[in-house]
């Protein structure tokens, strides 16, 4: 059963619309659905709300530590409420999936994502759930003929807003993720994964 849903992103208005904040977009939607408001909670180093989602009590968190220190926020809340790693779902932007794709998985490496890297270090475990929200990779924007020697600027890419057509399909993928949340919060994660990956 998932007791904590974390969305990753960077704090501040200048980052709100950037690809790296896709995790925040999901949490904002969940809070709206639950009719709750995230509030600044200093002991958890983030914006936090306790929500009732589909009959289950769930903690929602948006770390305000900047991406590469997200673990500090996650572990503070997890320890306070005695939440185990496999009861945590982390929603994050995923370079290795095209915009419009969203996938659930338990465990695994960080794939170069600094937020995941820091969470893994703070939890001393990789065994937490991830909701991977595809944002695409900057190499996909380079014509194939020019890709051979090109070095795409990933840091710049994730800190820019998606193009309009990308934003539309990312929003649609978040809607699909929201549709499986009743299963997620009830602990039916295999079923949720199958449904999400079918689409």
Swiss-Prot record:
The species this protein belongs to is Burkholderia orbicola (strain MC0-3)
Q: Under what name is this protein listed?
A: Peptidyl-tRNA hydrolase
> What is the documented function of this protein?
Hydrolyzes ribosome-free peptidyl-tRNAs (with 1 or more amino acids incorporated), which drop off the ribosome during protein synthesis, or as a result of ribosome stalling.
What phylogenetic lineage does the species belong to? Bacteria, Pseudomonadati, Pseudomonadota, Betaproteobacteria, Burkholderiales
Q: Which reaction does it catalyse?
A: an N-acyl-L-alpha-aminoacyl-tRNA + H2O = an N-acyl-L-amino acid + a tRNA + H(+)
InterPro entries found in the cross-reference section: Pept_tRNA_hydro, Pept_tRNA_hydro_CS, Pept_tRNA_hydro_sf
Which protein family is named in the record? Belongs to the PTH family.
| Subunit structure, as described in the record | Monomer.
The compartments listed are: Cytoplasm
As one GO molecular function, the record gives: peptidyl-tRNA hydrolase activity
